């Protein structure tokens, strides 16, 4: 039986990932700060055919993550797959978002994933291999307006994953980074906003996402099984990525022009409602 550790697995995308693996017969360490959510996920994992246990962990605290790693590798156990998933969002213009919100995002989104990699890599090297999936976002590729902290931290995770992919190849440790567009998940539950437009935009984007959390999870696990580096699950994400790489000036120029004319927010909402964001 293969063993996985998934952070942020008490709900949303982390839970979806756990269920995809459970149907393949995996044993999963379900990590989160939400005890009730973890217990719900555990019951669903068992019903889906997998095994598991819960582990309360605040990924923004290095000692919590290190304790989880020590426990995971204890008494000769393997960790075949680590999924760094826990994340949060703060919306607003860069200069308007309180610095404490920036720190909140950086502590969880960046440091939480770095702590995970830093704590689990030695054990994976010792056992002779493994795989790490880091959950980033298309926001890390495209840097959508009014999502500064989220963009910055997810871009950092993409860069971290690219670096680790090279460094860990010699040790038979694979690295995959998944970069989904908006889809219906529980990120909204703890999202921080500065004004009503951001609230409306976020709800519209998540509501009209073309894929479900489970569909994104299935695409992510298939990419891991093929040892791919990048996963961009939605077609629109792939389209935007190609457009940005071909002509960054056009990609950002359209948005900048719309903002200057005063209808940038209307354009953003329209794109979410037709499933283009």
Set out the residue ranges of the language-model regions:
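Canonical Rossmann dinucleotide-binding motif of NAD(H)/NADP(H)-dependent dehydrogenases/reductases
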Residues: 1-29
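Conserved glycine-rich Rossmann-like NAD(P)H-binding loop of the short-chain dehydrogenase/reductase
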Residues: 24-40
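The beta1-alpha1 cofactor-binding region of Rossmann-like NAD(H)/NADP(H)-dependent oxidoreductases
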Residues: 35-36, 55-67, 99
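Substrate-binding pocket helix/loop in short-chain dehydrogenase/reductase
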Residues: 93-94, 98-103
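Residue(s) in the substrate-gating loop at a strand-loop-helix junction
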Residues: 137
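SDR active-site lid
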Residues: 170-235
């Amino acid at each position: 039986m293969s063993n996985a550790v998934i952070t942020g697995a008490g709900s949303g995308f982390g839970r979806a990932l756990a269920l995809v693996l459970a149907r393949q017969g995996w044993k999963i360490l379900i990590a989160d700060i939400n005890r009730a959510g973890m217990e719900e996920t555990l019951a669903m994992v068992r019903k889906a055919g997998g095994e598991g246990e819960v582990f309360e962990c605040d990924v923004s605290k290095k000692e919590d993550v290190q304790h989880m790693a020590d426990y995971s590798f204890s008494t000769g156990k393997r960790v075949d797959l680590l999924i760094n998933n826990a994340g949060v969002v703060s919306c607003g213009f860069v200069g308007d978002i309180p610095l404490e919100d920036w720190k909140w995002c950086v502590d969880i989104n960046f440091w939480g994933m770095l702590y995970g990699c830093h704590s689990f890599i030695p054990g994976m090297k010792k056992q002779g291999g493994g795989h790490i999936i880091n959950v980033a976002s298309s926001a890390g590729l495209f840097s959508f307006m009014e999502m500064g902290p989220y963009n910055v931290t997810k871009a950092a995770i993409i860069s971290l994953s690219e670096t680790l992919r090279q460094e860990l190849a010699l040790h038979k440790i694979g690295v995959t980074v998944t970069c989904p567009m908006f889809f219906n998940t529980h990120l909204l539950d703890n999202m921080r906003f500065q004004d009503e437009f951001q609230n409306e935009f976020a709800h519209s984007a998540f509501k009209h996402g073309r894929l479900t959390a489970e569909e994104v999870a299935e695409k992510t696990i298939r990419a891991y099984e093929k040892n791919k580096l990048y996963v961009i699950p939605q077609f629109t994400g792939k389209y935007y990525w190609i457009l940005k790489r071909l002509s960054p000036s056009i990609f950002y120029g359209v948005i900048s022009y719309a903002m200057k004319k005063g209808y940038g927010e209307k354009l953003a909402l329209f794109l979410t409602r037709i499933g283009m964001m």
